[in-house]
Every structure is written in structure tokens, then in C-alpha cells.
Regions:
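A conserved mid-protein helix/loop that constitutes part of the nucleotide-sugar donor-binding site
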Residues: 19-24, 208, 212-231, 250
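Short His-centered aromatic/hydrophobic patch
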Residues: 101-107, 125
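Aromatic "clamp/platform" in nucleotide-sugar-dependent glycosyltransferases that forms part
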Residues: 270, 289
Length: 371
């Protein structure tokens, strides 16, 4: 049986949740059935996810090989024809039968034209649908509507509430839920000890380590995270903030300096050892302003960390009593909950539902057209 060529099409290969999911998809798909290739709109990334994909000898095709001011100008002026042209060439040269799309890359896809007619198209919504398809991103919604109408685009949600919202937004009833899956063994069977990882990262052995994983963007709310940590630091002189994520860290670091916490934090990026880094933490704090379903929060629960997260996060991400859900109130109130280990959460989902091996089988059935 000839293997089915699958394109995973995403805007870039950073170290965010969507990019991590794509990395896991192409790594874990049954290679007897599928032949995956990753297509990225913006190349030039240097990330742990990209390295892992390359190590697994999975091709990466870049529409734009670098991303600088000149390329951005070119994209703005000519992207409307160049991107569909490149996609069309890639689909033909790879003889692709399935294209699974992620993040904000839909608007140019309908212009590929007839080459889409014989393909199975899927799109995973990785954030709150209103943030993905409305306001300045209305072109994404228009493109999705065209692809649903003309090419039977299959919408994929990360949880049940998101599926309901997508069904209502696009007037469909068939949105499928495929959760952000995790390789449980990777986060449970970690040979590195807390002491070893702290030594490697130059974190004091006796520190109370407050951890966070997420790219440095507004929705992750790092400013509030620093405010919470500053309140924790008032009460615990051994408090240390460990953040993992790519992006512009200048605002976050300036705020830490203003609080006099210059020697009480560390920022890591492009890491492939997140499972070990979680071992170095005592508590995981996740105060997002809005979210789809954050992979890092579920990973922290699989690693048996106590987690404090905002109620902007889907309720289905709270799977154990170690995960406490809070409104974004005062930083002091959050600090008090972080420090009071007697406060427990109410599980709203089964952690086993996030087993990647289970979710990948569901995805494979979609790729095969078996619903």
C-alpha cells in the first residue's frame, strides 16, 4: 500500500504549543500509512521543535526561507499570489493527499484553486475562535468559510466548548475534538532529579521555584506573573522565578528589575528538555488572559506539579486536584494561593484523555477519511 503524503502547514516552527503539537504529530504518525512533510510559511527559525523534526528525518519546506524586513515587504506586496503559487507547487511535487493547517495561515489557501479538489483539508483552531477568526483576522474566517463550502474543510477543536463555538460560528455540526496530546511517559519517567536539574541550571538548591512555560506574548500575561512573583518574594526570601519561552523578554525583565528581583529569576528558550525543567519547579503558575487549551499546563499536571492557572483557560485543562483555577484578581491573592498548599482544585476532565498515543489514532482516522 502506498503511503499517504500528509502536509502539516503552519506559520513557523517556534517552540509554542501549536508548533510542539505539529512536531509530535509528524513524529508519531504511523509511518507505514503516512509520509509526513512540514510546510512553514516563515523559515529561519532555530528551535527545539525544528531540531527534533530534522533529527527524525522529516522534510521541512519553507515558503519564505528567511524572515526580515525585506521579506515582510515582499509578502505584503506579493504574498497574495506568491504563497498560493508556492503551495500549489509543493502539493504537486509532493503528490500530497492531506493538508492539515495550523495557526493563522488560511487566508491564502483558497487561491491554490483546483489542486485542493482532490485533497483532504483539516484546520486545527489552537486558540479562542474569536481571537483566530474575528477583528483584524476576519480574512481567516472568510477563507475558512470558502474552504468549508468548496473543499469540505474539516474543523478540529481542542475541547468541547471550542467545538460548540466553531460549529455556531461556521454553521456546521461536524467539528471534531482532538485534544492536545502528550507523551505521558516522557513527563512521568524522568531520570533527572530535581537537585541535578537545579545544579545544571544554576538555581539554588533550597529555592522555592515558581515556574512558567509560555512564549513572551501579551496573552500569556507575564507582567501579571511578575507582579504575583513579587508578592511571593515578599513572603519567601528563597523564592526564584523560572520562565521558559521564546520572544521579547525586555518588558518582563525590566519589571523584575523595578521590583529589585534581578538575581531572583532565570529565562530559558528553545528547550527540548521541558520534561526535566518541570522537575526543577515547585509550583507552576499560568495567568493567561485567554487560551485555547495550553499544552504546558497539562504537561505540568502529568509531571505532578501543583498548578495555579487563570479562569481564562478552558475548564477542560484542569484534570487533577493539583490544578487550581483562579480569576485574574489581585497579585497578592494569587500569591497567597500559590503559597497555601492546602488549597486544592476541582478536576473537570480526565487526564488520560490527553494521552498522545490515543489522540494520534483519532487523527490518523481523520487523515484516512474515516471520521
Amino acid at each position: 500500500m502506498e503511503r499517504i503524503k500528509v502536509i502539516e502547514y503552519i506559520s513557523n516552527l517556534g517552540d509554542g504549543g501549536a508548533e510542539t503539537l505539529v512536531k509530535d504529530y509528524v513524529r508519531l504518525l504511523d509511518r507505514n500509512l503516512f509520509d509526513p512533510v512540514v510546510v512553514v510559511l516563515r523559515g529561519g527559525e532555530s528551535s527545539a521543535n525544528k531540531r527534533t523534526i530534522e533529527e527524525n528525518k522529516i522534510p521541512i519546506i519553507e515558503i519564505f526561507h528567511r524572515w526580515n524586513i525585506w521579506v515582510r515587504v515582499w509578502k505584503k506586496l506579493c504574498g497574495w499570489w506568491y504563497i498560493p503559487y508556492r503551495l500549489k507547487r509543493i502539493i504537486r511535487s509532493e503528490n500530497a493527499k492531506v493538508m492539515h493547517m495550523h495557526l493563522m495561515i488560511l487566508k491564502d489557501v483558497p487561491h491554490v484553486g483546483k489542486d485542493l479538489d482532490s485533497m483532504r483539508l483539516l484546520f486545527t483552531c489552537h486558540s479562542v475562535p474569536s481571537k483566530v477568526f474575528e477583528g483584524e483576522r476576519i480574512k481567516e474566517k472568510i477563507a475558512a468559510q470558502k474552504l468549508i463550502r468548496n473543499n469540505q474543510l474539516q474543523l478540529i477543536a481542542l475541547h468541547d466548548d471550542m467545538a460548540t463555538e466553531l460549529n455556531e460560528m461556521f454553521g456546521v455540526q461536524n467539528t471534531v475534538v482532538i485534544r492536545n496530546g502528550i507523551d505521558f511517559n516522557r513527563f512521568r519517567d524522568v531520570s533527572t532529579t530535581k537537585e541535578e536539574k537545579r545544579k545544571e541550571l544554576s538555581i539554588p538548591q533550597n529555592a522555592f521555584v515558581v515556574g512558567h512555560i509560555g512564549r513572551f506574548t501579551d496573552e500569556k500575561n507575564h507582567t501579571y506573573l511578575v507582579d504575583v512573583f513579587a508578592e511571593i518574594a515578599k513572603k519567601r526570601k528563597d523564592a526564584f522565578l523560572l520562565m521558559v519561552g521564546a520572544g521579547d523578554t525586555s518588558v518582563t525583565e525590566q519589571r523584575l528589575l523595578e521590583y529589585g528581583l534581578a538575581n531572583r529569576y532565570q529565562i530559558l528558550s528553545h528547550r527540548s528538555d521541558v520534561n526535566e525543567i518541570l522537575r526543577a519547579m515547585d509550583v507552576f503558575v499560568f495567568p493567561s488572559k485567554y487560551e485555547g487549551l495550553p499544552l504546558s499546563l497539562v504537561e505540568a499536571q502529568v509531571a505532578s506539579l501543583r498548578c495555579i492557572a487563570s479562569d481564562a483557560v478552558s475548564i477542560e485543562a484542569f484534570c487533577t486536584e493539583n490544578a487550581v483555577r483562579l480569576p485574574l484578581s489581585s497579585a497578592e491573592a494569587w500569591a497567597n494561593v500559590v503559597l497555601d498548599t492546602a488549597i486544592k482544585g476541582n478536576p473537570h476532565a480526565n487526564l488520560d484523555e490527553y494521552d498522545m498515543n490515543r489522540e494520534i489514532k483519532r487523527l490518523e482516522r481523520l487523515y484516512l477519511g474515516e471520521g
